[in-house]
């Protein structure tokens, strides 16, 4: 029965009618500009539950920056190249990504206009606990889009509601230090060199010498898996024999990162289980195994009380170029979500590319409970980590004892300093190389704790210590003047810093 007592419905005002007409026009058949389809919304206010991505866009000539930003939003969410009627079967206004802010990049290095585009994504667009699904949207298809000359994902804000669906690191910095009973200093490591070609027995000898000399860890390199010259099982047996012997002789907890990277997940699980049976406290994986495999190994490590080390093998193919690819600060966030305990994050002073402030930003993303906006270190968003455990950053690649003061000053205590060639290339042998690094580290930690200015006094402090430590003196004589002083290819847009090398 009709209720005529209710107030009659008033005709829509002109603004409402215009809005409805504009909305209907988005579904006219044919090709429309992305910003006309609703992917450019400058008045949009992001919600606390939105995933926000910051892209550096370089439009093709003639493409307006707002249209380029809208295209990125569209192609990384719900759009295709033409209007489709099935949009009307979805809550497309909610699911549509929204480019809400575009601003020019200050002083673009390439000399052509670049823009920062801020894009918000509804949380329902992503599967819970899946970095693979997150990346399939954010970087899955849009990087090959023709209207863009180049595209780079610079940073992301991950909402707490989404972070809570991830396990995060299986062990974390606090629990790892408890297991190792090592506090108040960075951990020391080294990569076995040469990375390929050693027999299992000689490999184990390198591990023993390094640990006996004072290192906390030795490690496999990224490409040592199971090759004809050394089957993985042989390497594990000899390496763990060395670990147990060094532990018994030094009274310290030691470890070796046994690389379980393999061609299938079944093989990786088999290797990890064998490492655990041998008494290892840690296993290692490579970034190239992919996000689903990383997450799976993180869950295995959590269930089995193992530390999980990640080598960022392959990252330079997409992180190094300033105008195209993905910043490593984003990779660092994804790694923390997927669940690793260690992650290589740069040295600033070694042989691998990395601006000092940018590298500090990567470290902060991995090991802080909350990241505040810090444009000088490339951090664009406040990021609350919702209780996810902290990842221990790893400095590795072309570093030596003569740089110990720089490394400690840059990165502090919660880091792992890995000296591969700087240990195994020592003129008096591996054990002497390890001792040189341990003495250099303890010298710097003691001086810092006494209030000394290690950044400026470090070289003199090392020289003084070397008068009482022949291995350190030999290390300084061999590598003291070795630097890799090149201009970084990627540095923060809001602060230009020289190399510290």
From Swiss-Prot:
Reactions listed under catalytic activity: 2 (2R)-3-phosphoglycerate + 2 H(+) = D-ribulose 1,5-bisphosphate + CO2 + H2O; D-ribulose 1,5-bisphosphate + O2 = 2-phosphoglycolate + (2R)-3-phosphoglycerate + 2 H(+)
Cofactor note: Binds 1 Mg(2+) ion per subunit.
Modification N6-carboxylysine occurs at: 219
Binding residues annotated for Mg(2+), in chain numbering: 219, 221-222
Main enzyme class: lyase
Residues marked Transition state stabilizer (site): 351
Enzyme Commission number: 4.1.1.39
Residues spanning the membrane: none
Listed Pfam families: RuBisCO_large, RuBisCO_large_N
An annotated GO BP: reductive pentose-phosphate cycle
Annotated residues for binding of substrate: 141, 191, 195, 312, 344, 396
Cofactor dependency: Mg(2+)
Record bears the keyword Transmembrane helix: no
Active-site positions on this chain: 193, 311
GO MF annotation terms: magnesium ion binding; monooxygenase activity; ribulose-bisphosphate carboxylase activity
Protein family membership: Belongs to the RuBisCO large chain family. Type I subfamily.
Role noted for this protein: RuBisCO catalyzes two reactions: the carboxylation of D-ribulose 1,5-bisphosphate, the primary event in carbon dioxide fixation, as well as the oxidative fragmentation of the pentose substrate. Both reactions occur simultaneously and in competition at the same active site.
Miscellaneous notes: The basic functional RuBisCO is composed of a large chain homodimer in a 'head-to-tail' conformation. In form I RuBisCO this homodimer is arranged in a barrel-like tetramer with the small subunits forming a tetrameric 'cap' on each end of the 'barrel'.
Database matches in NCBIfam families: PRK04208.1
Subunit structure: Heterohexadecamer of 8 large chains and 8 small chains.
Name of the featured protein: Ribulose bisphosphate carboxylase large chain
Species in which this protein is naturally found: Paraburkholderia phymatum (strain DSM 17167 / CIP 108236 / LMG 21445 / STM815)
Upper classification of the organism: Bacteria, Pseudomonadati, Pseudomonadota, Betaproteobacteria, Burkholderiales
Gene that encodes the chain: cbbL
